[in-house]
C-alpha cells in the first residue's frame, strides 16, 4: 500500500493481490480492506506457510477463503486467476490443474463471489 501511495497514480498503478504471497509475509485477511478500490487482479494459490510454492488450494495452510472474502468485501469483482508451479508428478499435470480449478471454483461459489455455474 505504501508503494501505491508513493507512486501516486491511483488510476494507473494498482495492486495484484497474490494470496499466498500475502500469507507468507504474515498479512492478515482483514488487512486487505486497506486496498479497497486499488485491486486490479487476484492470484489464488496455496503454500505451506514457509516457502513460496503455488499449490492447488487445500494443499497448504493459506486461509484462501478468508482472503477471498476480504477481497470481495472491498468491492472487487474482477479477474481471479489460479497460479500454480509445476506438479511434483508431471505426468499428472492435468489432474493438478483440475484440482486447483475445482477447489477455487468451490471456494468462490461458497462465498457467493459469482453466480454458481450450471453443470
Predicted region positions:
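Histidine-acidic metal/acid-base catalytic patches
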Residues: 1-119
Amino acid at each position: 500500500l505504501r508503494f501505491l501511495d508513493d507512486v501516486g497514480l491511483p488510476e494507473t498503478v494498482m495492486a495484484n493481490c497474490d494470496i499466498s504471497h500475502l500469507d507468507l509475509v504474515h498479512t492478515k485477511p482483514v488487512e486487505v480492506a486497506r486496498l479497497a478500490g486499488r485491486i486490479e487482479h487476484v492470484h489464488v494459490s496455496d503454500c505451506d506457510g514457509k516457502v513460496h510454492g503455488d499449490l492447488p488450494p487445500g494443499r497448504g495452510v493459506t486461509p484462501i477463503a478468508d482472503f477471498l472474502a476480504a477481497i470481495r468485501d472491498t468491492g472487487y469483482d474482477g479477474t481471479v486467476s489460479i497460479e500454480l508451479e509445476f506438479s511434483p508428478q508431471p505426468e499428472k499435470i492435468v489432474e493438478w490443474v483440475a484440482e486447483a480449478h475445482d477447489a477455487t471454483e468451490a471456494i468462490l461459489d461458497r462465498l457467493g463471489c459469482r453466480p454458481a455455474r450450471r453443470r
